[in-house]
Amino acid sequence: RRQRQMCLRDRCGSIYSLMHRIFEGNHEPLFGRATQQIFLKPFSTITLKQILSENNPGYTSEDLLAFYAFTGGVAKYVELFVDNKALTHHKMIKLMCQENSPFLSEGKNILIEEFGKEYTIYFSILSCIANGFTARTAIESYLQREIGGYLTRLENDFNIIKKRIPMFSKAESRNVRYEIEDNFLRFWFRFFYKYIRYIEAGALEKLQEIIIRDYPTFSGHALEEYFKCRFREKGEFTALGGYWNRKGEDEIDLIALDEIEKKAVVAEIKRNRQNIKMDALMLKGASIQKELNGYSVEYRGLSMEDM
């Protein structure tokens, strides 16, 4: 009967947890009824470069990195920067720190409704992750409370964080790091939420100074994510990730595997090419030599020059 009806019903929503529950909750009336689901994704790194090139032909690699770090390719944020002609990394920071800037309250506006009355706990956890406390034990030590259930919901119900384990580890590995999925939210919790008292006091120029001061460190992580996206978009690799041992040492920024052709890329990623130490990278690679046995391994140094 359904096949005979010429009827198309679309349902869309911006609250991820609600849409997930309505269509994928086992006890919900619409469970299993959807014939197709479309998840809106950010622009690719190639598209971001095209947008920046069309609107700022003289852009630098620093501008491109900032464009990616602040937007993650999300159309709403891309549009705000383009419409305001803020397409250099300094102009982007200045725009975000202006009085009445929509960026200042964006994180709170989109997440409070998601989290409900427990939003302060979730915000504290996300702030910890954005500021480098990426292991559960480190977050719990800082917050002085157990957070296992909250991490599970942030990952599975809200799709805001993702769990990272070292390449070649078993899925049940306890050597876990957490990171915020969305680039802008990572930035928002790192700066706007952390320094919310500056915003409330109207000290936006001071906030801008802090962002400019800490931007090189913050953008280093964004550069790693940029290259992971680039490699993923190529579709040439069957597994992508990083590596670190149980002590958090021998860290490798990017490992890309083609498990069919038995090819591997092992890469060190730095903002400045002169800071890449290929000898040190190859020594780290020795710690995973067993796992790469049978692979043709290429060691690479990737920097902003390669964007």
List where the protein language model places each region:
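A short beta-strand-to-loop transition that corresponds to the Sensor-1 phosphate-sensing loop
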Residues: 11-17, 21, 74, 303-306
